[in-house]
């Protein structure tokens, strides 16, 4: 495209390639530099120089604090039980992302490649929780998106570039900060092709979405509508370069273990049974995943090729589910205990009851996600009655409460305490 075909600012003459935003009006354009200049004049304050505007939203190299992999993992450990290999992989990838940003800010001649991460594993194993925990500790903008809501351009649904808009919003519309952020996309396996053969019809939610995501993952200058939605002529856009954004994607990839077993020449007999041996075999197979297995599942080679780190989250054991109930900083048992303490009532869980809850969650086959529902159903009636009953001192949850549906043990206050 020749320069005369590029839109240019009607005031300073800069082309759309030289500015972050170029706002269009009827036969006229104005760039972000001129807007800031005019704003300074209107406020009767000196307008910043062009170079200062270009760098004002970019932190200096020394201001970017780089957490070590051990520091990152220690923060994740406070909320996520198990998944040691996945947590180490994520910690190293994020650490290298920080170093890459700092190298770019220092204009080093040697540039580091992105280590985009693909997390695979069963529902409720902690993939999304790892991502949400990262959002709490990182000094870069972070956003989470759901791949199942995405469609390729021209179809009803969410445009892929809206993911970048969310990151921009997380950065308070600071383009420079957004361009060094991290995006987590959940349920990525749901956009796999349903067949290995290329369809002659349009694939609205599969390969087409992978192709659209591929563009922003490998790096492009995306024109983002500030308020989201579909693009239309004469609309204002914000230009965001996605080249240095780190992408982490996760998915359950159901039956991927069988594809791996077929490649390795192993049998999967008994894998449908949720025995400890079957789970161990499945986790062992997922640890041996190769690019060809993911392609056979329905992911396109170009998409998978953008993820240097592929790591599986193992199915949670019974002991790990019990730990999730009680150990993390925001453990669900701690949450309910505090809720009852506000009513001056002690909530006591016997050890056997905790294991019974964990076993019930394991049978639900949704991992840690089932724990909250089980406790909510268990304690709902008590939370309704207790605020109106000043005679209750404590509630004890026993194993039979879970396995036999017996009511919890209610311990009454002494008459003197009530008086």
Swiss-Prot record:
Keywords: ATP-binding, Chaperone, Metal-binding, Nucleotide-binding, Zinc
Gene Ontology biological process terms, A to Z: cell division; proteolysis involved in protein catabolic process
Domain ClpX-type ZB: 1-50
Binding site for Zn(2+): 9, 12, 31, 34
A Pfam family: ClpB_D2-small
GO CC field: HslUV protease complex
Gene Ontology MF terms in the entry: ATP binding; ATP hydrolysis activity; ATP-dependent protein folding chaperone; protein dimerization activity; unfolded protein binding; zinc ion binding
Residues binding ATP: 122-129
Subunit structure: Component of the ClpX-ClpP complex. Forms a hexameric ring that, in the presence of ATP, binds to fourteen ClpP subunits assembled into a disk-like structure with a central cavity, resembling the structure of eukaryotic proteasomes.
Homology family: Belongs to the ClpX chaperone family.
Function as written in the Swiss-Prot or TrEMBL entry: ATP-dependent specificity component of the Clp protease. It directs the protease to specific substrates. Can perform chaperone functions in the absence of ClpP.
Protein name in the entry: ATP-dependent Clp protease ATP-binding subunit ClpX
Organism: Chlamydia trachomatis serovar D (strain ATCC VR-885 / DSM 19411 / UW-3/Cx)
Taxonomic placement: Bacteria, Pseudomonadati, Chlamydiota, Chlamydiia, Chlamydiales
Gene: clpX
